[in-house]
Design a protein with these regions (language model features):
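Glycine-rich phosphate-binding loop and adjoining helix at the ATP-binding site
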Residues: 34, 39-47, 51, 62-129, ...
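Conserved beta-strand elements of the Class I
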Residues: 3-7, 129-131, 170, 238
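Glycine-rich phosphate-binding/hydrolytic loop that grips phosphoryl groups
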Residues: 19, 110-120, 245, 249, ...
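Short beta-strand scaffold segments in enzyme catalytic cores
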Residues: 14-19, 75, 137-142
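Short glycine-rich, Thr/Ser-proximal phosphate-binding strand/loop in the N-terminal lobe
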Residues: 2-44, 62-64, 82-84, 153, ...
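Adenine-nucleotide phosphate-binding core of ATP-dependent small-molecule kinases
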Residues: 35-55, 59-61, 180, 186-238, ...
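Glycine/GP-enriched mid-protein hinge/lid loop-to-helix segment characteristic of carbohydrate kinases
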Residues: 30, 37-41, 104-108, 117-210, ...
């Protein structure tokens, strides 16, 4: 069976998979992201992962033959290069750096690709925001059932909206960014925990320091999302990424705080992603299928056995 390679690059984990023509995930692998070892080490790890997944393999008795690669990465991204990533210290890394050239590779923004998968999966809204929250925060802006990239393709950098001017430093160079207060990584770090999940658990058990960090994160999210709502009027805000696993512990207070800030109009619906943590991987699969079509290998629906 012909398939595509999909890799979703996260701040802590590289999620890889082989995706069937119908979008089913046939094979999964995860590897740690060596973020603390420097920009070049992350590029090398991604390149090795691409090479390994690009080899034919037999899964459940079926020979899988990868035909293209989709690579979804964080930061400011074009189809030709990763322009900037605060998480990895990248500047102007060409797409070719992630591959040996054996298969066509499509590079795309992780959140926008995940948003495209979420939009394709449905049901959704004609005007919405897909907001995965993990190591960082960025959004996929959906306007009139289409993803909106902006003038340079960089729309949706919600994680760098200042919610506390002069506040905590952010790797982007600003202070007081939303990501400095409400990303999963910042929540864990500020509460002295390994993961945001640990902070949620402590807060639910009545631990005051953890509850304070969690409340500040929710308030920061509500402030940024109120600003977004007043500008673009979404019908729905979809929370994804690792922090979405908090479920009602996140969604319930966020709905309440968002409604409290939008004093003269109703708040948009806030819900958790239907695709969960697979949205990024499936979005990378869509990138790969597009690359295959551009190489003359067929459209997304033309991949055959």
């Amino acid at each position: 069976m012909t398939c595509v390679v999909a890799i979703d690059v996260g701040g802590t984990t590289l999620k890889g998979g082989l995706i069937a023509p119908d979008g089913a995930i046939l094979h999964r692998e995860r590897r740690p992201t060596p973020r603390t070892e420097g920009p070049d080490r992350v590029i090398a790890a991604i390149s090795a992962f691409v090479a390994d997944l690009s080899r034919p393999r037999t899964v459940a008795g079926t020979l899988l033959r990868p035909a293209a690669v989709g690579l979804a990465v964080p930061g400011l991204v074009t189809s030709e290069k990763a322009v900037f990533s605060a998480a990895f210290g990248w500047r102007d890394v060409p797409a070719a750096a992630f591959s040996d050239g054996r298969l066509p590779l499509a590079l795309g923004h992780d959140v926008r690709s995940a948003g495209e998968a979420e939009l394709a999966h449905g049901p959704g809204a004609a005007d919405a925001l897909y907001l995965p929250i993990g190591t960082g925060i960025a959004g996929a802006v959906v306007l009139s059932v289409s993803l909106y990239g902006g003038a340079a393709g960089w729309a949706g950098q919600i994680g760098h909206i200042p919610v506390r001017p002069g506040g905590l430093p952010c790797p982007c160079g600003q202070r007081g960014c939303l990501a400095a207060y409400a990303s999963a990584a910042s929540i864990a770090a500020r509460a002295g925990e390994t993961t945001a999940e640990d902070v949620v658990r402590r807060a639910a058990a009545g631990d005051e320091p953890a509850a304070r960090v969690w409340a500040e994160a929710v308030e920061a999210l509500a402030l940024a999302l109120a600003t977004y709502t007043l500008v673009l009027d979404p019908a729905m805000i979809v929370i994804g990424g690792g922090l979405s696993l908090a479920g009602d512990a996140l969604v319930a207070p966020l709905r309440a705080r968002l409604a409290a800030r939008l004093t003269f109009r109703p708040a948009p619906e806030v819900r958790v992603s239907a695709l969960g943590v697979d949205a990024g991987l499936l979005g990378a699969g869509l990138l790969a299928r597009r690359a295959l079509g551009q190489q003359g290998g067929g459209d997304v629906d033309d991949l055959g056995a």
